[in-house]
Structure formats: C-alpha cells, structure tokens
Amino acid sequence: GSGKTKVLTTRIANIIYQKKAYPNQILAVTFTNKAAKEMQLRVSKLLGSDAVGLSWLGTFHSLCAKLLRKHATAVNLNSNFTIIDVDDQIRLVKNICKSENIDIKQLAPRYILAIIDKWKNKGFYPSEVIINQKDIYEKTILPIYKIYQQKLIDLNSCDFGDLILHVVKILEKNKDLREIYSKNFKYILVDEYQDTNFIQSRWLKL
C-alpha cells in the first residue's frame, strides 16, 4: 500500500542524497502504474532536479518492455514491437482455434489464454512446457500456445506475459549482458515483494 511506497520513496531519496548511487543505478519496481507515478512524484518532490535520471523506476511490465526494446532481436522481434491487449489476444486465439478445428464452445479462448499465461508466469516457452497429465485440456492447449507464440513473433508483437518472459530468457542466455545490468544496478527495490510470482522473482534475481 501507500505506506510501503512511502518507505521505498524515502529509501530512494536517501540513496541519491547520500550519493550511494546515481539515479540510473537504482532499479525500483512496483506492481501498478499508480504506485510508480506516485513514487516518481514523491522522489521529485524530495530531491528536485537530483531525481532526474531515475529512468529505471516503474512496473514490472514497463521496465521489462524497456529492456526488451533494447534487446528485441535476441528473441526475433524488432525494437518497435507492439504490445497486444486482451481483446487482440482473444481474437488471435479464436483464429487459431478456427484453423485448427477446435470448438471454442468446448474450450473458451479466455481459458486457453489463462493456461498460456500460467505457463509464461512459470517461465515456460512452448517447447519447455511439461503437460499436467491430469488436465485433459492442456494437451489441446499446448499446440495452440506454439502457434500463438509464432504468430506473435510474425506480427512483431508481445502479450504482457512475454515482456517478462522474453527478458528472463535473454538474460539467462547472455552472461555478459547479465553482468552489465547487475553491475549497473547498485540497488534493487521492490514494492510488495511478497506478491511476486515465479517469473517476476526470477527476473529480479538475474
């Protein structure tokens, strides 16, 4: 809540004020845009022009989008990729189901997307998914996930889940890049750390 955000803001201000780090050496992550905006405003109030350069303050998704634009080619995207919303995701899944003769009355697109999202949050690309044998639908959904990911790449697009997933995969594969970022960020501060899911905490640990 905002009490936590306040504590975090004060910490950021102190780090910069005491010259323990430059603003761009602080990675500050929030869950909501509202909290990110609030933090930015508070730090600016406390520090004035010294707060300039706090360029790594934002939500998981906004920070990962920023990182991904820098390294998009590593996952076969261009840096001007688009981020698709839920309506576009549903449309895409409906089209795939149609071409694969899957009855969306039996298997709702929203449910398909929920499973895909679950896999992404666990850090799995389609080739890495291990199907839960007890789930009769996962067998059907995995091939859809494969096509869905390929279509996103073809469209030079990402969904929200991809933003973090792609960045984690890029950093896992590239030791040099990982070292550049871990050397750059002297402080990593997270609002509500206990709420992070697997892929989010994996990203923070990299």
Each language-model region and where it sits:
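Walker A/P-loop
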Residues: 1-11
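A basic/glycine-biased coupling hinge at the interface between accessory DNA-binding modules
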Residues: 13-187, 198
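Charged catalytic and DNA/RNA-contacting regions of genome-maintenance
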Residues: 191
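Short, conserved "post-DEAD/DEAH" coupling segment immediately C-terminal to helicase motif II
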Residues: 198-206
